[in-house]
């Protein structure tokens, strides 16, 4: 009762404050727009697009984590196929700005216009999230690393240096987006300002003390976006429920956006759940979070919006191989996403829906190469149970129009006859449609509970099911029980089976319901009198019909498979168990993301994936994927005479109830060639006294001051970013005269970093790294007779960092914080010798962006990379051959580069996914770091001493599926024991597919070697 009273007070106050300036909805809540367009509006209930309410079910993908534009279609088609109305993406400033005078939105995978065009073609809205800061477990949170020196201030504020830095990128990104807004007939419907920037207040938000610096920064971004053509609403995402930032409903402070949202990861955003206790409290599996009161307090006149809700978790360096998918698997999907509906959330974007790969130097130190994120679409682009489980809800929310406008009427166990089960009652105030979200009273409990439910319907108050039996929650599950649900011109009075979707075909409705396998369901169709079973799954028991009070009640138990019931008034009801529902599809025959029922869908049962369908005259063209021979059944208009699957006509038969049946053939099998011959060369000549470091690969490290707020303990400044070298491996050569007994080094490189040291070609030792240590010091004592008392000595430090920290840590330096020589005679208080000078080498060309296609992330400073051994076309004919193909091994502390070429000839008409598998042979040393290169792309960081990732998916486009492939492996042994590594690859899946990956034009993504590289030796 307290909540209802509070809601009324808020409603009255909002009307009083806003009625003069805003339109009113049917219930009195103010209807907002941004003053620039009414194409997008919103109120307490939901977003409206072109005047129609929409349940925004969205998912995130990052185009820069899959740098093959031809595969963006694959990801977006899979998002659309699952029933999502929307997708979201971060754009990455770092990806588009390799240096402070370049903004590139045209080269290779930097041209983002195909994303907008695909959204229009496929029929999905877009939430654009341009940063400039994005977090995203990306190095420096997506900032270009040239920004991290301190020369641009402390960042994320109104400092003019920082402002002038972000403007070129932000203005170009905004200008491109402005052409693809909903106001221009395209599909961008909101634009996020910054990211998880909850800094509006200087202290506790309840005290309302403005942070004028943060406000000025937000206003600069908002002004820039408007000046460069953005007309759609601005959004912002609070990082947690404590920030209370940027809501017009909460305060009239500056910087507020149009619609605010909340990011939430109730099961922790990382597989290491201890990292989330400061935000979430102690981790308790399946513990849901109350959001209703938060939104009612913070943003009552806006839709309850979650710009990021947990779609999975990233895997930290020491996390398990393959991630922690069980933590956010099908039970998490089923329970938590329905729980959000119980909390009146009508706009929700899953982070991530497709994660991708931290290829090159994308990653922040918190994670390794994989960014699979345990997402519904896996890193290798496959789909499985989590994707299908998500589809069960997203198809429902797309079809449940009345769900976009509901009030929370009540909640508790009083709705059920089982105190272990509670329900949340949502009701549409206009249509009186009801949605009862049921779950365990204690969400952490996964017991098998049977119950009946008290519901309010247009036929009165009922207890359902009515014909006996029960509703069941078996495990960590939730069910949404609907009442007075409209499908076409008909009304579902109630259903204890969940609604999957419906279609109006030839002006006749087909309703699709599902239950978990072997569970029962009951539904009542208003005004219907009779029904019959026209198809029943093989092991399903009888389906019962009962006419009561002018309505037809149908009771059933659904074993594995599909049943079909025909009801008078030309109503068809399809009954599915969970396994059949997983493979049930509703491709839209329209580009409208709202999928109006008069433009409708067709319904298809059976395939692994249905990407799309189109109808022309009497031919229904279906595009999709099959991974084995599959029986399919299609519910389509009566005039359909021909069905094609990926352009090939299917032999069909017609069922007695009007569906069409066919069989899709299995795809061809694929056998990958074996790696049989490798070449090898030494990739650390810099350790040798004879090496000449005077070439253009090297830069004097001679800065005696730094703008970085973290000052070094010794000079010169040995921060790699100061000298234009930003990624991974950097090499430092320090010179001194006379003798010394050793050196003390303090190096900072992020979690899991490491370094090794050599004096005059002699190996001194290594710091091997630790998944939780970002900075380490080491004292290396010099062996006798290694130093040259009368000539110059050279210390080489090879240092590997794992990216820049996120948020306020972006400026944390990478490099040597302290370097001190130890005196040779400690008994006579002799003066410590000093380094005379230092030089540094890193990525070939530094910030010059020598390889604009692969980009600034791709390469480190290893000799092999600088001179281009990893690139296609390099001549390795003079190299030594490896004696064994089973293991690439050597002794001694150095870096070796192994190289081979191998052909592929993948047939047309298939989608094929391939992963590399790296390992360490039994009893071989594991104190090494390896990098996998595929046709010039660094697509794997393998660190068996610290990490557990061994499988590295590599997409087509990086791999050449119809030609020669150059594979390279750089192996850095950090002890004299050397290293041994195994390299293999595997097929993840083969599908007969409309995607046809071998037909993608990707040659321009793999530029080859040129002699220009030799100058960086």
Swiss-Prot record:
<feature type="binding site">
    <location>
        <position position="137"/>
    </location>
    <ligand>
        <name>substrate</name>
    </ligand>
</feature>
<keyword id="KW-0325">Glycoprotein</keyword>
<dbReference type="Pfam" id="PF13363">
    <property type="entry name" value="BetaGal_dom3"/>
</dbReference>
<keyword id="KW-0964">Secreted</keyword>
<feature type="binding site">
    <location>
        <position position="135"/>
    </location>
    <ligand>
        <name>substrate</name>
    </ligand>
</feature>
<dbReference type="Pfam" id="PF13364">
    <property type="entry name" value="BetaGal_ABD2"/>
</dbReference>
<keyword id="KW-0732">Signal</keyword>
<dbReference type="InterPro" id="IPR001944">
    <property type="entry name" value="Glycoside_Hdrlase_35"/>
</dbReference>
<dbReference type="Pfam" id="PF10435">
    <property type="entry name" value="BetaGal_dom2"/>
</dbReference>
<feature type="binding site">
    <location>
        <position position="373"/>
    </location>
    <ligand>
        <name>substrate</name>
    </ligand>
</feature>
<feature type="glycosylation site" description="N-linked (GlcNAc...) asparagine">
    <location>
        <position position="777"/>
    </location>
</feature>
<feature type="active site" description="Proton donor">
    <location>
        <position position="196"/>
    </location>
</feature>
<comment type="function">
    <text>Cleaves beta-linked terminal galactosyl residues from gangliosides, glycoproteins, and glycosaminoglycans.</text>
</comment>
<dbReference type="GO" id="GO:0000272">
    <property type="term" value="P:polysaccharide catabolic process"/>
</dbReference>
<feature type="glycosylation site" description="N-linked (GlcNAc...) asparagine">
    <location>
        <position position="681"/>
    </location>
</feature>
<dbReference type="InterPro" id="IPR017853">
    <property type="entry name" value="Glycoside_hydrolase_SF"/>
</dbReference>
<dbReference type="InterPro" id="IPR037110">
    <property type="entry name" value="Betagal_dom2_sf"/>
</dbReference>
<dbReference type="GO" id="GO:0004565">
    <property type="term" value="F:beta-galactosidase activity"/>
</dbReference>
<feature type="glycosylation site" description="N-linked (GlcNAc...) asparagine">
    <location>
        <position position="23"/>
    </location>
</feature>
<feature type="glycosylation site" description="N-linked (GlcNAc...) asparagine">
    <location>
        <position position="211"/>
    </location>
</feature>
<dbReference type="InterPro" id="IPR036833">
    <property type="entry name" value="BetaGal_dom3_sf"/>
</dbReference>
<dbReference type="InterPro" id="IPR025300">
    <property type="entry name" value="BetaGal_jelly_roll_dom"/>
</dbReference>
<feature type="binding site">
    <location>
        <position position="195"/>
    </location>
    <ligand>
        <name>substrate</name>
    </ligand>
</feature>
<dbReference type="InterPro" id="IPR031330">
    <property type="entry name" value="Gly_Hdrlase_35_cat"/>
</dbReference>
<keyword id="KW-0119">Carbohydrate metabolism</keyword>
<feature type="glycosylation site" description="N-linked (GlcNAc...) asparagine">
    <location>
        <position position="158"/>
    </location>
</feature>
<keyword id="KW-0378">Hydrolase</keyword>
<feature type="signal peptide">
    <location>
        <begin position="1"/>
        <end position="20"/>
    </location>
</feature>
<feature type="glycosylation site" description="N-linked (GlcNAc...) asparagine">
    <location>
        <position position="770"/>
    </location>
</feature>
<feature type="glycosylation site" description="N-linked (GlcNAc...) asparagine">
    <location>
        <position position="417"/>
    </location>
</feature>
<feature type="glycosylation site" description="N-linked (GlcNAc...) asparagine">
    <location>
        <position position="829"/>
    </location>
</feature>
<feature type="glycosylation site" description="N-linked (GlcNAc...) asparagine">
    <location>
        <position position="737"/>
    </location>
</feature>
<feature type="disulfide bond">
    <location>
        <begin position="271"/>
        <end position="324"/>
    </location>
</feature>
<dbReference type="InterPro" id="IPR018954">
    <property type="entry name" value="Betagal_dom2"/>
</dbReference>
<feature type="glycosylation site" description="N-linked (GlcNAc...) asparagine">
    <location>
        <position position="828"/>
    </location>
</feature>
<feature type="active site" description="Nucleophile">
    <location>
        <position position="308"/>
    </location>
</feature>
<feature type="glycosylation site" description="N-linked (GlcNAc...) asparagine">
    <location>
        <position position="456"/>
    </location>
</feature>
<feature type="binding site">
    <location>
        <position position="265"/>
    </location>
    <ligand>
        <name>substrate</name>
    </ligand>
</feature>
<dbReference type="InterPro" id="IPR008979">
    <property type="entry name" value="Galactose-bd-like_sf"/>
</dbReference>
<keyword id="KW-1015">Disulfide bond</keyword>
<protein>
    <recommendedName>
        <fullName>Probable beta-galactosidase B</fullName>
        <ecNumber>3.2.1.23</ecNumber>
    </recommendedName>
</protein>
<feature type="glycosylation site" description="N-linked (GlcNAc...) asparagine">
    <location>
        <position position="785"/>
    </location>
</feature>
């Amino acid at each position: 009762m307290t909540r209802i009273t509070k809601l009324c007070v808020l409603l009255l106050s909002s009307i009083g404050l806003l009625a003069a300036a805003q339109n009113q909805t049917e219930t009195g809540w103010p209807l907002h727009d941004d003053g620039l367009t009414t194409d997008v509006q919103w109120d307490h209930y939901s977003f409206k697009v072109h005047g129609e309410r929409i349940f925004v079910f969205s998912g995130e993908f990052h185009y820069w984590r899959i740098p093959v534009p031809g595969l963006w279609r694959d990801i977006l088609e899979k998002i659309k196929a699952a029933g999502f109305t929307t997708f979201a993406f971060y754009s990455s400033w770092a990806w588009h700005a390799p240096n402070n005078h370049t903004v590139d939105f045209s080269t290779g995978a930097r041209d983002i216009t195909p994303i907008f065009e695909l959204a229009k073609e496929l029929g999905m809205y877009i939430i654009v999230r341009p940063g400039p800061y994005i977090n995203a477990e990306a190095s420096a949170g997506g900032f270009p690393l040239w920004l991290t020196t301190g020369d641009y201030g402390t960042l994320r504020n109104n400092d003019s240096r920082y402002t002038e830095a972000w403007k070129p990128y932000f203005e170009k990104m905004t200008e491109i987006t402005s052409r693809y807004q909903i106001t221009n007939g395209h599909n961008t419907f909101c634009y996020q300002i910054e990211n998880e920037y909850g800094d509006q207040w200087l202290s506790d938000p309840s005290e309302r003390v403005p942070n004028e610096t943060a406000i000025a920064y937000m206003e600069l971004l908002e002004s820039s976006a408007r000046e460069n053509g953005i007309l759609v609403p601005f959004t912002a995402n609070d990082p947690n429920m404590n920030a209370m930032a940027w809501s017009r409903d909460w305060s009239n402070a500056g910087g507020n956006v149009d619609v605010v949202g909340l990011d939430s990861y109730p099961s922790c955003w990382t597989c290491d759940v201890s990292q989330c206790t400061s935000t979430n409290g102690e981790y308790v599996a399946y513990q849901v979070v109350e959001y209703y009161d938060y939104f009612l307090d913070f943003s009552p006149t806006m839709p309850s919006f979650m710009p990021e809700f947990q779609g999975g978790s990233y895997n930290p360096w020491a996390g398990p191989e393959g991630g922690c998918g069980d933590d956010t698997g099908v039970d998490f999907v089923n329970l938590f996403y329905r729980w959000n509906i119980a909390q009146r959330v009508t706009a929700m974007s899953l982070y991530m829906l497709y994660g991708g790969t931290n290829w090159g130097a994308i990653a922040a130190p918190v994670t390794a190469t994989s960014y699979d994120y345990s997402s519904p679409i896996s890193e290798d682009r496959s789909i499985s149970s989590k994707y299908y489980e998500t589809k069960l809800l997203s198809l429902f929310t797309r079809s449940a129009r009345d769900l976009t406008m509901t009030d929370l009427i009540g909640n508790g166990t009083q709705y059920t006859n089982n105190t272990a089960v509670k329900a949340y009652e949502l009701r549409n105030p206009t249509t009186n449609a009801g949605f009862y979200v049921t779950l365990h009273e204690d969400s952490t409990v996964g017991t098998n509970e049977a119950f009946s439910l008290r519901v309010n319907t247009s036929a009165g108050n009922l207890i359902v099911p009515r014909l006996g039996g029960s509703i069941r929650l078996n495990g960590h599950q939730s069910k949404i029980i609907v009442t007075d649900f409209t499908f076409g011109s008909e009304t579902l009075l109630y259903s204890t089976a969940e609604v999957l979707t419906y279609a109006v075909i030839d002006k006749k409705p087909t309703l699709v319901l599902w239950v978990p396998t072997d569970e029962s369901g009951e539904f009542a169709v208003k005004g219907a009198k009779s029904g019959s079973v026209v198809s029943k799954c093989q092991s399903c028991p009888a389906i019962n019909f009962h006419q009561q009070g002018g309505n037809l009640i149908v009771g059933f138990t659904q074993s594995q498979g599909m049943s079909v019931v025909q009801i008078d008034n030309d109503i068809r009801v399809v009954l599915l168990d969970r396994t059949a529902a997983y493979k049930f599809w509703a491709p839209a025959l329209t580009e409208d993301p709202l999928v109006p029922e008069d433009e409708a869908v067709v319904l298809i049962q059976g395939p692994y994936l249905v990407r799309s369908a189109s109808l022309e005259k009497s031919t229904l063209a279906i595009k999709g994927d099959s991974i084995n021979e599959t029986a399919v059944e299609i519910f389509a208009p009566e005039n359909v005479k021909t069905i094609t699957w990926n352009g090939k006509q299917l032999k069909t038969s017609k069922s007695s109830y009007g569906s069409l049946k066919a069989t899709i053939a299995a795809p061809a099998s694929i056998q990958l060639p074996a790696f049989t011959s490798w070449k090898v060369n030494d990739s650390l000549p810099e350790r040798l006294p004879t090496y000449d470091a005077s070439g253009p690969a090297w830069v004097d490290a001679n800065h005696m001051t730094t703008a970085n707020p973290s000052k070094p303990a010794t000079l010169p400044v040995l921060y790699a970013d100061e000298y234009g070298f930003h990624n991974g491996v950097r090499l430092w050569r320090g010179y001194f005269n006379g003798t010394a007994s050793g050196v003390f080094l303090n190096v900072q490189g992020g979690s899991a970093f490491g370094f090794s040291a050599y004096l005059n070609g002699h190996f001194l030792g290594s710091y091997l790294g630790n998944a939780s240590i970002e900075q380490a010091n080491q004292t290396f004592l010099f062996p006798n007779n290694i130093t040259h008392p009368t000539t110059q000595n050279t210390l080489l430090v090879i240092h590997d960092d794992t990216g820049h920290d996120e948020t306020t840590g972006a400026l944390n330096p990478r490099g040597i914080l302290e370097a001190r020589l130890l005196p040779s005679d400690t008994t006579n208080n002799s003066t410590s010798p000093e380094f005379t000078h230092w030089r540094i080498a890193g990525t070939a060309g530094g910030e010059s962006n020598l390889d604009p296609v692969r980009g600034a992330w791709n390469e480190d400073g290893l000799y092999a990379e600088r001179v281009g051994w990893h690139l296609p076309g390099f001549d390795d004919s003079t190299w030594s051959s490896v004696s064994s193909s089973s293991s690439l091994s050597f002794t001694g502390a150095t870096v070796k580069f192994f190289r081979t070429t191998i052909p592929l000839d993948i047939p047309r008409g298939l989608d094929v996914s391939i992963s590399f598998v790296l390992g360490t042979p039994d009893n071989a040393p594991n104190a090494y770091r390896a990098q996998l290169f595929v046709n010039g792309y660094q697509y794997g960081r393998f660190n068996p001493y610290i990490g557990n990732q061994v499988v590295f998916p590599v997409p087509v486009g990086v791999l050449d599926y119809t030609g020669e492939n150059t594979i390279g492996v750089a192996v850095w042994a950090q002890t004299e024991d050397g290293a041994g590594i195994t390299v293999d690859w595997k097929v993840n899946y083969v599908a007969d597919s409309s995607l046809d990956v071998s037909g993608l034009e990707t040659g321009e993504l793999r530029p080859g070697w040129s002699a220009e590289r030799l100058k960086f030796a």
